[in-house]
């Protein structure tokens, strides 16, 4: 999407900074594009294992050739290429965090959550080439959002959409009718598949879409 491309291009201009994007705008997709265009070892810090799983799925979909490791709980197998790190695994007092210095880029997902003292200390002492923070809102009720620019850098780009993720649909009138007094789905499916006018309409829509893409 064009707004995603604009956000990626803007963020690539800076070595550090925050990307503000509402839910549904595809922050992970944009981050994957940034990873693809910066050929440096990258650590993605996420606040939960659930997000770690989502990141794994996104990386597998958009960057299938990239080696992905994970550092969370008992699962500590790093690839040194792109590694997903849970915040809890590096924010405890006894956590080993030296390995983070090997990365050229740190991406902090949901960066507004870095107010935890342990995680803040870890990130504040990192000396990396690129630091990217991503969040839907850079504000915290406890006032600790003032730390975000010190850790991730200033806000570099804000995605502003009236309705994030909006998709417009066109309804085509097929003139199909189903006269049976009882609704029996298998019979309805059969009748739909046999309707010549509807089938021709579908074929025309597909043909026009293919021509638009060519």
What kind of feature is each model-predicted range?
Residues 104-105, 112-170:
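Post-DEXD/H (motif II) to motif III coupling segment of the RecA-like Helicase ATP-binding lobe
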Residues 72-105, 116-121:
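Conserved helix/coil segment N-terminal to the catalytic DExD/H
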Residues 1-15:
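N-terminal pre-P-loop "Q-motif" helix
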Residues 34, 180-214:
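Conserved interdomain hinge at the start of the Helicase C-terminal
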